[in-house]
């Protein structure tokens, strides 16, 4: 026999108290406290010593078998010990895993039980609250009932007084009737007899009433008054007749009031019935409470059954642990095979095994003792608590039953007493009626009786007061009982809390089991758990002491209640004795009054028959109604009991259904919650992703907006810089225009002097021919048109100080400058300089062609004609606006041209003025064809500028509509003229503005030449002539030609605006086409020169009023001299 086997045999502990008192045995689960003890160490088999103290139980036959087998050899035993230790280790590990699994299951079950327990506690608390409410309602109903009883008693007293008054009235009426019936003589005789009787009985009255001497005098007075009344009877007869009539009327009124009072009594009885019904309801509530108490007892029984089931489960877990031990043995066999491979670990294992053996023995000893102590203590505590709880419940039940029975008996007794008192009062009323009938005869006796009655009434009132005080005491006792019930409920709640604490302790013990089973891994934690268990035992001992103190306090309170009950019983017995005495006294008085009433009934029976019949009918109705009420109360009590039983059953069924529904609801809610949680998590993830995307998009948009804002700011800065540059350029242009004006004036003066000198030479006979030859050679004087060299009015208006300047124009100009892409902001200041360079550095001048690159505002036909004398060369169309790609000049070229312009500004101005004032000269001979490369280049430029002509020609045409009708007609004539003869003139007709646009396209005919000198188209054709006649291949000259085209277009626009503003007439020069290129050029030149001189003179007279357009000799040599001077 091992300690484990002994511990397995301990299945349950029965409490002898429960067994003795009710025959109930409470089985407690050992699985919550007792862990499965490990097997005994193998050292017990070697005979070295047994530490368990169970050697007496061992069988000697087993030892013999061991010796026979050879198990007692030390070597084999050591090996077996090692194997057993390894097996034990494996078994312990398996047990640990099994116990952990079981503990997990137990924890799950524990959670379920905790939830169920919480639900039951909630139901119990609700039931307690309902009980408290019902108790408060019951107390309130009791107080109301008692108040109503007092009110009813007061009402009864008032009704009795009314009845007495009515009886008095009836008596008086009866007396009047008797007096009316009897004759005066009979009345006198009766009066004498009454006086004699009064005198005879006065001695008896005097003997009885020594205590009231004052009333004796009153009796003597009344006797004398009776004597006087006898004498006055005759006088009263007439008065009584009149009073009879009044009394009849009063009788009718009294009967009406009596009926009203009867109705009031009926209503009062109905109220009493309602009160009785409320009392029955209160009884029902009390029965319900009893049923709830019974339900609680049933629940406790169920808990006991659950504990038994737990014990069974523990046994099952023990069997499972044995199976796990078998599995562990199998694993140990496998470990033995592994031990052979790991000899190095055996030394450490042996040392650890010795330590584990010692530690196991200590643990086994401690566990065996401590666990058994804890189990015994807990079982004893639980048994004592259960017994106390059951005893308390039984005592409370008994006390409640007794109190209810007492209350019911008291109510019934009170009812019986009330009925008896009513009957007695009725009898007393009858006796008093009889006595009042005899008042006239026996007033002295009646007064004495009245005194005695008054004294008795005082006694009764004192008794009633005492009864009311006793009732108050009873109420206070009831309240104290209710307080005790509340305390009992509190104790129950505390007991439930303690049960919860015990369950928690059981849980902690289970946790300790787990920790003990894991002692191989958690040896250090075992000590702390043992300390915790000790602390817990101390806590349990303290709780036991507290419970004992509470029990003692409860017993003391119960003893106090018993004492109060004993005092109450004594008082009750005393009250019952006093009641019996009072009833005896009432019986004696009733018998005496009956004897007196027997003498008077004969006289009053006839008059009181009607009243008795009414009273009897009323009493019969009252008794019938009371019996019916009692039967109803009994039936209602039985119904209430049945209803309570049905309520119990329904409540049990509802509780079971609620539990099932709650479990189902919990499962459904958990599933729904998981579904919702997953859905919400998915939604949250999607929202997060969407938010991240939106944030990324917002960040990208924000970065783009920031970049755009930065670009806009940069662009604004550029625009501001460009506007500043534009304003600076405009200011520079204004200064240049002013300088040019001054130089023109100087040049005009020099020109006038030169012309005067030429005229003087012409007048000379010998020098005239030379001068004519000089003039006809190349020199053509420019016209002194000062308006054309001035900057345009729009440019002057756009100056910073002008009033016509606008921001929109500045912004447009700046944007156009940006679009050009190559220093477009500097071009307005370079236009005039580039014009000067175009005049000076013209390639036609180097080859000594007769091309006049004069003023772009007023081109004469002579220069155009000279340029168009080359055969096989097509005129190029002029681009009337600046293009950023083709007509723009690079910055390096502009710098180069600026440097060249600064050197040759004076010479360019001279040539410009000469060409502007020169008339249509005589055409020269055609030179050889130009270089084909230049023509190809100009053709490409023509193609690139073709597309832009259509959109920009209208700009110049609109500006020239004011005074350019002749120009337009002249261009159309030159465009459609075909082949003409030499010096062919065309009549110029005025044309309406906007009729036709300039036709600037290149003509297919070779010799067709446009010859407008003064307008934009003429300027463009001059540019084309200059580009076509350029024989040089230098890139500098080509760029100069391109810049000349752009600058001349600008100056043409300015000249047109100036001419339109100044209304200056424009001379249309008829073109001349050279069809013949004969070698006899001298004759043709002479004739053409004469014609040209005449035409130029006519044109100059028409336009300017000057004769400066005639050819003069010596102009070609001056031009050459200026060219050589400037180039060198």
From Swiss-Prot:
Keywords: Coiled coil, Cytoplasm, Isopeptide bond, Membrane, Nucleus, Phosphoprotein, Ubl conjugation. GO terms for biological process: nucleus organization; regulation of nucleus size. GO terms for cellular component: cytoplasm; nuclear lamina; nuclear membrane; nuclear periphery; nucleoplasm. Residues 73-365, 391-730 form a coiled coil. Its main location: nucleus. A motif (Nuclear localization signal) lies at residues 966-973. Disruption phenotype: Altered nuclear morphology. In plants lacking both CRWN1 and CRWN2, moderate dwarf and leaf-curling phenotype associated with endoreplication and strongly reduced nuclear size. Plants lacking both CRWN2 and CRWN4 exhibit slightly smaller rosettes. Plants lacking both CRWN1 and CRWN2 exhibit markedly smaller rosettes. Plants lacking CRWN1, CRWN2 and CRWN4 are extremely stunted and set few seed. Residues 1012-1025, 1076-1108 have a biased composition (Acidic residues). Residues 917-927 have a biased composition (Basic residues). Residues 1-22, 38-59, 806-829, 847-1128 are annotated as: Disordered. Residues 904-914 have a biased composition (Polar residues). The keyword Cytoplasm applies. The keyword Metal-binding does not apply. Residues 847-858, 870-882, 939-950 have a biased composition (Basic and acidic residues). This is Protein CROWDED NUCLEI 2.
């Amino acid at each position: 026999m091992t300690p484990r086997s002994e511990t397995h045999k301990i299945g349950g502990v029965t409490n002898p108290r429960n067994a003795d008192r009710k025959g109930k045995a409470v089985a407690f689960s050992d699985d919550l406290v007792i862990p499965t003890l490990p097997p005994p160490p193998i050292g017990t088999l070697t005979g070295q010593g047994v530490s368990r103290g169970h050697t007496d139980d061992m069988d000697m036959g087993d030892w013999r078998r061991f010796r026979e087998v050879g198990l007692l050899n030390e070597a084999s035993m050591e090996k077996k010990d090692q194997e057993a230790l390894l097996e034990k280790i494996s078994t312990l590990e398996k047990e640990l895993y099994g116990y952990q699994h079981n503990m997990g299951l137990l924890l799950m079950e524990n959670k379920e039980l905790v939830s169920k327990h919480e639900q039951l506690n909630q139901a119990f608390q609700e039931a307690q609250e309902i009980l408290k409410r019902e108790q408060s309602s019951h107390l309130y109903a009791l107080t109301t009932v008692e108040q109503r009883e007092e009110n009813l008693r007061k009402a009864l007293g008032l009704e009795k007084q009314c009845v007495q008054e009515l009886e008095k009235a009836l008596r008086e009426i009866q007396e009047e009737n008797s007096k009316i019936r009897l004759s005066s003589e009979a009345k006198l005789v009766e009066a004498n007899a009454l006086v004699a009787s009064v005198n005879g009985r006065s001695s008896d009255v005097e003997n009885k009433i020594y205590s009231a001497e004052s009333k004796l005098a009153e009796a003597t007075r009344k006797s004398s008054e009776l004597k006087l009344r006898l004498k006055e009877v005759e006088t009263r007869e007439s008065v009584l007749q009149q009073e009879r009539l009044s009394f009849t009327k009063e009788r009718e009124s009294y009967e009406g009031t009596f009926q009203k009072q009867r109705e009031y009594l009926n209503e009062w009885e109905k109220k009493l019935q309602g009160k009785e019904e409320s009392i029955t309801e209160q009884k029902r509530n009390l029965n319900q409470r009893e049923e709830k108490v019974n339900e609680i007892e049933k629940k406790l029984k169920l808990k006991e059954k659950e504990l038994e089931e737990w014990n069974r489960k523990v046994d099952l877990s023990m069997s499972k642990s044995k199976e796990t031990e078998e599995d562990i043995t199998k694993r140990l066999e496998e470990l033995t095979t592994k031990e052979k491979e790991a000899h190095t670990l055996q030394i450490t294992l042996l040392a650890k095994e010795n330590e584990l053996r010692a530690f196991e023995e200590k643990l086994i000893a401690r566990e065996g003792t401590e666990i058994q102590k804890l189990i015994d203590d807990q079982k004893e505590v639980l048994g004592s608590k259960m017994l106390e709880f059951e005893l308390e419940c039984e005592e409370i039940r008994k006390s409640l039953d007794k109190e209810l029975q007492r209350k019911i008996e008291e109510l019934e007794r009170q009812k019986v007493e009330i009925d008896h008192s009513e009957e007695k009062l009725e009898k007393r009323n009858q006796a008093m009626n009889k006595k009042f009938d005899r008042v006239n005869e026996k007033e002295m006796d009646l007064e004495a009786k009245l005194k005695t009655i008054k004294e008795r009434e005082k006694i009764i009132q004192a008794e009633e007061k005492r009864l009311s005080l006793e009732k108050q005491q009873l109420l206070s006792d009831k309240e104290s009982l209710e307080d005790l019930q509340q305390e009992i409920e509190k104790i129950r709640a505390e007991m439930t809390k303690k049960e919860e604490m015990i369950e928690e302790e059981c849980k902690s013990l289970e946790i300790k089991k787990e920790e003990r089973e894991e002692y191989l891994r958690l040896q250090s934690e075992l000590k702390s758990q043992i300390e915790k268990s000790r602390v817990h035992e101390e806590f349990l001992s303290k709780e036991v002491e507290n419970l004992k103190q509470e029990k003692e306090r409860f017993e003391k309170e119960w003893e106090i209640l018993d004492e109060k009950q004993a005092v109450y019983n004594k008082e009750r017995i005393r009250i019952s004795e006093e009641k019996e005495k009072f009833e005896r006294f009432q019986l004696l008085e009733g018998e005496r009054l009956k004897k007196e009433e027997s003498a008077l009934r004969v006289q009053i029976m006839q008059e009181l028959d009607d009243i008795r019949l009414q009273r009897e009918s009323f009493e019969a109705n009252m008794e019938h109604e009371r019996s019916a009420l009692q039967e109803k109360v009994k039936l209602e009590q039985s119904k209430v009991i049945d209803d309570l039983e049905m309520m119990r059953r329904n409540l049990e069924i509802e509780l079971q259904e609620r539990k099932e529904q709650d479990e189902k609801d919990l499962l459904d809610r958990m599933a729904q919650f998981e579904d919702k949680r997953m859905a919400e998590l998915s939604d949250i993830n999607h929202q997060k992703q969407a938010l991240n995307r939106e944030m990324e998009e917002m960040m990208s948009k924000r970065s783009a907006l920031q970049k755009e804002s930065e670009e806009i700011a940069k662009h604004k800065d550029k625009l501001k810089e460009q506007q500043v540059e534009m304003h600076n350029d405009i200011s520079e242009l204004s200064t240049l225009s002013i300088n040019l004006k001054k130089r023109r004036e100087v040049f005009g003066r020099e020109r006038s002097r030169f012309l005067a000198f030429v005229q003087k030479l012409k007048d000379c006979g010998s020098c005239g021919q030379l001068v004519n030859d000089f003039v006809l050679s190349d020199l053509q004087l420019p016209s002194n048109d000062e308006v054309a060299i001035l900057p345009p009015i729009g440019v002057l208006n756009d100056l910073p100080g002008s009033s016509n300047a606008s921001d929109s124009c500045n912004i447009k100009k700046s944007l156009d400058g940006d679009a050009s892409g190559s220093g477009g902001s500097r071009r307005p200041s370079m236009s005039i300089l580039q014009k000067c360079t175009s005049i000076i550095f013209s390639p036609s001048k180097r080859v000594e062609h007769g091309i006049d690159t004069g003023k772009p505002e007023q081109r004469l036909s002579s220069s155009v004609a000279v340029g168009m004398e080359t055969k096989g060369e097509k005129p190029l169309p002029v681009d009337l606006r600046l293009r950023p790609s083709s007509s723009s000049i690079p910055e390096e070229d502009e710098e180069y041209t600026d440097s060249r312009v600064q050197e040759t500004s004076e010479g360019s101005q001279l040539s410009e003025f000469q060409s502007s004032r020169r008339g249509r000269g005589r055409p020269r001979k055609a030179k050889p064809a130009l270089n084909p490369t230049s023509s190809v280049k100009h053709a490409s430029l023509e193609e690139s500028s073709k597309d832009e002509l259509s959109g920009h020609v209208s700009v110049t045409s609109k500006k020239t509509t004011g005074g350019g009708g002749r120009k337009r007609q002249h261009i159309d004539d030159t465009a459609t003229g075909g082949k003409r003869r030499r010096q062919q003139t065309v009549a110029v007709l005025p044309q309406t503005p906007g009729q036709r646009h300039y036709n600037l396209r290149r003509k297919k005919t070779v010799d067709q030449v446009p010859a407008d000198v003064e307008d934009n188209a003429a300027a463009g054709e001059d540019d084309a002539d200059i580009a076509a006649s350029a024989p040089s291949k230098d890139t500098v000259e080509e760029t100069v030609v391109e810049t000349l085209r752009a600058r001349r277009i600008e100056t043409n626009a300015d000249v047109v605006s100036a001419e339109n503003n100044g209304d200056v007439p424009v001379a249309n020069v008829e073109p001349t086409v050279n069809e013949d290129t004969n070698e006899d050029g001298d004759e043709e030149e002479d004739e053409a020169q004469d014609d040209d001189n005449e035409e130029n003179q006519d044109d100059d007279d028409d336009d300017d009023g000057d004769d400066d357009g005639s050819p003069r000799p010596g102009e070609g040599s001056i031009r050459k001299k200026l060219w050589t001077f400037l180039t060198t």
